[in-house]
Amino acid sequence: MIMAALPFKLFASIQYLLPQHGLSRFVHWAVRIRQPWFKNALIRAFCRFYRVDLAESVCSSPESFECFNAFFTRALKPGVRSVCSEPDAIACPADGMISQLGAIKGTRLFQAKGRCFELAELLGGDRSRTEAFENGSFVTVYLSPRDYHRVHMPVAGTLAAMTHVPGALFSVNVATTENVPNLFARNERLICYFDTAGGPMAVILVGAIFVSSIETVWHGEVTPPRSKTIRRWDYSGQGLRFERGAEIGRFNMGSTVIVLFGPGHARWRAGIGAGMSVKMGLSLGSCR
């Protein structure tokens, strides 16, 4: 991979020079090309390079997908992911790797290697929402290119609101988390707020350089078009309830999911920590 061939600081520095949004617009177009020779070759090359196993997918061959984006956001066969069944369990929202997990120290979340970022900046400056999660808990799950890219509910809850925060599109990996300050609070992100039996919860889908769009099951594609201002939606009173493990959104190309809980509600399981590979539905802890 390119990142492996470059020192981490150099790789991160190059990110500042790239036309991030232009590249994402190009990817949005390219991954929707339906010419069989093009999309089949692209899917095969991607599977070889990233060692993608299609055995778990509903569609198991490149020819079965209408375009590369359909492959990237592929559905899994029923039963290949089991969702934890303990009454108070927190289910992992996605396949990937735990980047960080722990407590929100006042208003600060740990990013990597001594770097932290502010909760208020992550939430787009929404003071009332910020207060609900101060001294709470968080988990950050990184989705690699080979992973299943649909996002699911960690605990049962009712959708309260959604916020889209425009921003940069740095790639998300070890190099950038260690070297780009406030990475998750400066990248484009979609924040979904839920009311749960264990208090407020936020599920945040963080964009990256080749994340051509983010969508939810209740709204559809949120980006593009990309806005230069923060957009907010109020869903209170609409009764949009989702059970634990239900699909709520997806990355069209992938990145990172951050889940926030209010103070005193989440307790992480022993043995769950940064660097651990996880599958959607795995119990990460409990929420009361």
Swiss-Prot record:
Keywords: Cell membrane, Decarboxylase, Lipid biosynthesis, Lipid metabolism, Lyase, Membrane, Phospholipid biosynthesis, Phospholipid metabolism, Pyruvate, Zymogen. It is found in: Cell membrane. It is an enzyme of class 4 (lyase). The modification Pyruvic acid (Ser) is found at S255. It is a peripheral membrane protein. InterPro entries: PS_Dcarbxylase (IPR003817), PSD-B (IPR033177), PSD_type1_pro (IPR033178). It catalyses: a 1,2-diacyl-sn-glycero-3-phospho-L-serine + H(+) = a 1,2-diacyl-sn-glycero-3-phosphoethanolamine + CO2. One of its GO terms (biological process) is phosphatidylethanolamine biosynthetic process. One of its GO terms (molecular function) is phosphatidylserine decarboxylase activity. Its cofactor is pyruvate. The record marks G254, S255 as: Cleavage (non-hydrolytic). GO terms for cellular component: plasma membrane. Heterodimer of a large membrane-associated beta subunit and a small pyruvoyl-containing alpha subunit. Belongs to the phosphatidylserine decarboxylase family. PSD-B subfamily. Prokaryotic type I sub-subfamily. Catalyzes the formation of phosphatidylethanolamine (PtdEtn) from phosphatidylserine (PtdSer). This is Phosphatidylserine decarboxylase proenzyme. It comes from Methylococcus capsulatus (strain ATCC 33009 / NCIMB 11132 / Bath). The lineage of its organism: Bacteria, Pseudomonadati, Pseudomonadota, Gammaproteobacteria, Methylococcales. The gene is psd.
